[in-house]
Amino acid sequence: IFLIGLTLFIFNLDKIINFKFLILIISIIFIGFIVSKTHDDFAFYHLQQSINFSKSKIQFGLSNLDFSYAKHSSLLYLNSNFYLPYFKYYFFNAPNQFFLTAIIITLSIFVYDKKNEKFLRYFALFSLSYILLKFTRSSEYGTDIIGQLLIILFIYLTILFFLTNNVLLKKEILVISGL
């Protein structure tokens, strides 16, 4: 999958409009990988489940041992895809970094978009400042915070849905919110 994405990126390199912005995003994500680490209690709760998911072992009755094996975040399935044999579990925080960077960039685009109404721009600015002040380090939040950040983005899109009169934009918002 990575090689397919890299090939498509190289072939479509001439179609990228803002190449400097793309380099900035890639640099931020790369620095985030180097600096970030997992949450302090990651080894106690989420590591075992992510390793079990990545090794694809079917084990019955684990919920009888501990309640955390019965109820888990769906993001742990995503974390388990980043188990690489050489690096082992050191890339389990990659989805956290991807989501955090994407949400920060999306909210900053919403803040600077002059076509948005003032209320939406203030909401995006307030949400962006909250995220940047609350999560100054990547290790300060666990795997469940990503869902809450996505809810902030969903609330923004819901408000935009009710404030806009553009039918095409409403359809796009419904598709994005459904994903």
Task: Give the ranges of each region predicted by the language model.
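Multi-pass, polyprenyl lipid-linked donor-dependent membrane glycosyltransferases
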Residues: F98, A124, L133-T158
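Membrane-interface alpha helices of multi-pass inner-membrane proteins
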Residues: F135, E172-L179
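Membrane-interface transmembrane helices that cradle and orient dolichyl/undecaprenyl
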Residues: D113-E117, F154-E172
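Membrane-helix interface and helix-disruption motif detector
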Residues: I1, I16, F87-F91, R137-I146
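Transmembrane signal-anchor helices characteristic of membrane glycosylation enzymes that use polyprenol
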Residues: G5, N18-D41, Y130-L132
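Active-site lumenal/periplasmic loops and adjacent helix-entry segments of GT-C-fold
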Residues: F30-R121, S138-E140
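Membrane-embedded, hydrophobic transmembrane alpha-helices
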Residues: I1-K15
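Membrane-interfacial loop-to-transmembrane alpha-helix junctions, especially the N-terminal start
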Residues: N18-L22, K115-L125, L169-V175
